[in-house]
């Protein structure tokens, strides 16, 4: 099911036009419905990180779980830091752990802390597809990683044959959002055994607006 750029732009334009004005900037999301895929077979499920060419159009919340050099590098960039001691405190409260997992879009963690993170937070971060980006404890500059994460979306195909992904905000141009959608589609199609022939339909919508089909 090949998609023409102009048809994507047209659907984005319509989705934005049909969205009622809200007192906040709405996100734009894409839903990719798949067919002829057996999700009982683990090899057909996947997790992906897609770098959007035009970014997400809004701030991304990043927390760094670290001590020492990595924590210092994070503070220089104004990022929230969770120390190993704080990690153990959070682990003692499931409510706090869930709140933490919900609050941030991405986590960065120094490698030596990963066993603790897996033990204490894995059950909260794993299902949300938010396990940390792992860095060496000697890293002194997080800028390249942070800049990449600001443009990254994590998507996964798990139990249902549909993949959802944020692709921008209503304030972005139709063309920018369309290019972001193309990046997501190409990444998903690249993971499918029979490529685009397994794409059943694609819809785009704003947070509160109706879904608009992208005609193939």
Swiss-Prot record:
GO terms for molecular function: rRNA binding; structural constituent of ribosome; tRNA binding. Keywords: Repressor, Ribonucleoprotein, Ribosomal protein, RNA-binding, rRNA-binding, Translation regulation, tRNA-binding. Pfam families: Ribosomal_L1. Gene3D superfamilies: 3.30.190.20, 3.40.50.790. GO terms for biological process: regulation of translation; translation. One of its GO terms (cellular component) is large ribosomal subunit. It comes from the Archaea. Belongs to the universal ribosomal protein uL1 family. NCBIfam families: PRK04203.1. Binds directly to 23S rRNA. Probably involved in E site tRNA release. Part of the 50S ribosomal subunit. This is Large ribosomal subunit protein uL1. The lineage of its organism: Archaea, Methanobacteriati, Methanobacteriota, Thermococci, Thermococcales.
């Amino acid at each position: 099911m090949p998609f023409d750029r102009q048809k994507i732009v047209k659907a984005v334009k319509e989705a934005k036009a049909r969205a009622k004005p809200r007192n906040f900037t709405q996100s734009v999301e894409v839903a990719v419905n798949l067919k002829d895929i057996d999700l009982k077979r683990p090899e057909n499920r996947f997790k992906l990180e897609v770098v959007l060419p035009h970014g997400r159009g809004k701030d991304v919340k990043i927390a760094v779980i670290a001590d020492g050099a990595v924590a210092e590098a994070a503070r220089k960039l104004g990022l929230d830091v969770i120390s190993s001691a704080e990690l153990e405190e959070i682990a003692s409260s499931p409510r706090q752990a869930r709140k933490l997992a919900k609050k941030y879009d991405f986590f960065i963690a120094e490698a030596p802390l990963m066993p603790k993170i897996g033990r204490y937070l894995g059950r909260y971060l794993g299902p949300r597809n938010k396990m940390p980006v792992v860095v060496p404890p000697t890293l002194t500059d997080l800028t390249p990683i942070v800049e990449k994460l600001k443009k990254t979306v994590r998507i996964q195909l798990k139990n249902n044959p549909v993949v959802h992904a944020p692709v921008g905000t209503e304030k972005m141009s139709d063309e920018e959002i369309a290019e972001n959608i193309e990046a997501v589609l190409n990444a998903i199609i690249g993971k499918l055994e029979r490529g685009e022939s397994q794409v059943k339909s694609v819809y785009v919508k704003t947070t509160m607006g109706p879904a608009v089909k992208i005609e193939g």
